Amino acid sequence: DDMEWINQQLGRKAFIWLNYPVNDYCQSRMLMGKTYGNGLDINEMVSGFCSNPMEYAEASKVSLYSIADDTWNMPAYDATSSWNQAIAALMPTAPEAFRWFCENNVDLGKTGHGLRREGESPLFPQGQEAGWKPYEDFFQKQVAEASLLLADSINSPEMLTEIKPWVESMCLQGLRGLTV
């Protein structure tokens, strides 16, 4: 419905500029989440599609991989499957640690437009219902996965150079969480 409406207003097929995973409006964040939001039936309704990546070329590849997958075959696009494939392809020697990093670096935080991304730290809310143990497990996993990524930097040096400050922060957050 949205694409039909906008195309009617434009008098032509729309060109989509996806402003993701760009983080110029939330520079303290890495936007490593799944790429979603467009209908799977719009392939015949658009004239083109492009993305606005982050200033971090390697880290942007998580989303760009999915965008390429989506634009190649929109009706069959699966955001979760594509995201998992991107993670495995980009960090083949530590995919689980990289997945943990990515799923804990999703949300934009507070912005002027109020948009929030779904899926940030999916295991963290469990502690709100079950007491301290899930939090302890979460923080221990944070430290372990961050340490694994930092130790694996020889296998994906360009990626680790870009995400290292956020990986180190993830490790420190985990350590802090364990001491509280």
Q: Which positions does each model-derived feature cover?
A:
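C-terminal functional modules
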Residues: 76-180
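Catalytic-core regions of glycoside hydrolase
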Residues: 1-80
